[in-house]
């Protein structure tokens, strides 16, 4: 079983709509238009405290993620498309969240620089993803 697919892609399959909040003036990654994010690093940590770094490849994890807050979706290069559960703008950060199958995830994207960090949480392990976003 591919743990990445189970933990990252599956939890993104959500059903609730997104509501944006925050001031009108913001950076290019404020969620007002779609953008792409490249995953550059993945860390998997077990409940035992052992961690392992994973190489990002399209076979084990999506290297590119499309974030479309107005369309309320996150999608990968495959046919996978997921609804966002919540989105908020807080102190210059776009924060996206969701949950499914007993797992939760949260992504924080800097509105000015596009730097991204994602946390995926399960009872037995966590994944931390890092990357950078760009406008298409």
Features from the language model and the residues they span:
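Bacterial N-terminal signal peptides that target proteins for export
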Residues: 1-11
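Contiguous, well-ordered beta-strand patches that form the walls/edges
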Residues: 69-105
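Cleaved targeting-peptide boundary
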Residues: 22-34
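Short, solvent-exposed coil/turn segments at beta-strand boundaries
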Residues: 67-71, 89-93, 108-117, 135
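C-terminal segment of classical bacterial N-terminal signal peptides
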Residues: 14-23
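Glycine-rich, low-complexity intrinsically disordered segments
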Residues: 130, 135-136
């Amino acid at each position: 079983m591919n743990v990445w697919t189970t933990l990252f892609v599956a939890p993104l399959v959500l059903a609730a709509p997104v509501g944006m909040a925050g001031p009108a003036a913001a950076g290019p990654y404020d969620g007002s238009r779609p953008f792409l994010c490249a995953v550059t690093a993945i860390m998997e940590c077990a409940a035992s405290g052992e961690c392992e770094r994973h190489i990002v490849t399209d076979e084990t994890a999506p290297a590119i993620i499309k974030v479309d807050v107005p369309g309320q979706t996150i999608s990968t290069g495959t046919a996978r498309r997921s609804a966002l559960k919540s989105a908020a703008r807080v102190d210059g950060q776009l924060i996206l969240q969701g949950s499914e199958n007993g797992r939760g995830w949260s992504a924080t994207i800097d509105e000015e620089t596009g730097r991204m960090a994602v946390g995926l949480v399960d009872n037995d392990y966590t994944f931390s993803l890092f990357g950078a976003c760009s406008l298409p």
